[in-house]
Amino acid sequence: MSDSQPLLLRAARGESVERTPVWMMRQAGRYMKVYRDLRDRYPSFRERSENPDLSYQISMQPFEAFQPDGVILFSDILTPLPGMGIDFDIVESKGPLIQKPIRSLSQIEALQPLEPNATMPFVGEVLGRLRESVGNKAAVLGFVGAPWTLAAYVVEGKSSKNYAVIKAMAFQQPDLLHRLLNHFAESIATYLRYQIDSGAQVVQMFDSWAGQLSPADYDTFAAPYQKRVVDLVKSTHPDTPMILYISGSAGVLERMGRTGVDIISLDWTVDMADGCARLPEHLGVQGNVDPGLLFGTPEAIRERIVDAVRKARGRRHILNLGHGILPGTPEDNAKVFFETGKTVDNLIGSAA
């Protein structure tokens, strides 16, 4: 068995691997003291994510602390928006704010095609530096927001509890929304290609708010554009594994499996055994420990990891949380998660 490629990359490709790889969504962030200390010195999120030295440093913090099998770019799904002509800010404890929400045909027609090399070269620089730093000790992950979720932010203008504004557009002006979604699909595919060319070995698409759609509306406003992104990327980078994550995905799990991605990331509301049974065998799975469990005891964390990995046995599986790690999570418990993840196959074997 060759170890010339990182474990997580080999697992994501469906190769036989020596153990289950593990990483964590939002593994670089507020639960880590080193991140909070840096945030105190650089309070602007956009500066932290768009200054290549800061983004690189933050991306490496969890790798230096826990040695996960994946190192993900520290960035945000909204980072490409200014390159399309949409300005935004991220306010601490409030989330993203879009200065001028996109709600008219003239605004959509004014959007620019994304040219990542020109408008966000810092992303390419950070990905290249991460590859140089981690070598084959970890896979470098890139990520994007899917078209529906990006549209939800730019139409609503901020995070939302009921998504009334974009749903009003969907049901009153569907042609307008489809134009916006198509623009995002083309630009996001361009952005993913840029990330891969810059050093990302595995990429994840977050359609965080697609779980707010009924299955029928998911088929209309989310899935076709997820698939469009996947098709465009696979046409030029067929060997790069692609992961799809949706928060609250239980109602659309089978539909996710038809988008062309390689791996479905399950949230914690789906039992791992049920998720595996509902998805075609050729698809890998990622997840899916409840991030809230990391406030519990080490014993409870270990037990839940063993349960998830045991239920995913026989499948291509990447251990992860079912959502991003929560602020305030004890760092020692994050350490338990990673250490258990690296030894869980032995734990299952000894208990068998």
From Swiss-Prot:
GO process terms (BP): protoporphyrinogen IX biosynthetic process
Any one GO molecular function term: uroporphyrinogen decarboxylase activity
Record carries keyword Chloroplast: no
Pathway membership: Porphyrin-containing compound metabolism; protoporphyrin-IX biosynthesis; coproporphyrinogen-III from 5-aminolevulinate: step 4/4
Alphabetic keyword roster: Cytoplasm, Decarboxylase, Lyase, Porphyrin biosynthesis
Highest taxon above the source species: Bacteria
Keyword Transferase set for record: no
Annotated site residues (Transition state stabilizer) in this chain: D76
Task performed by this protein: Catalyzes the decarboxylation of four acetate groups of uroporphyrinogen-III to yield coproporphyrinogen-III.
Protein's name in the database: Uroporphyrinogen decarboxylase
Organism the protein comes from: Prochlorococcus marinus (strain MIT 9313)
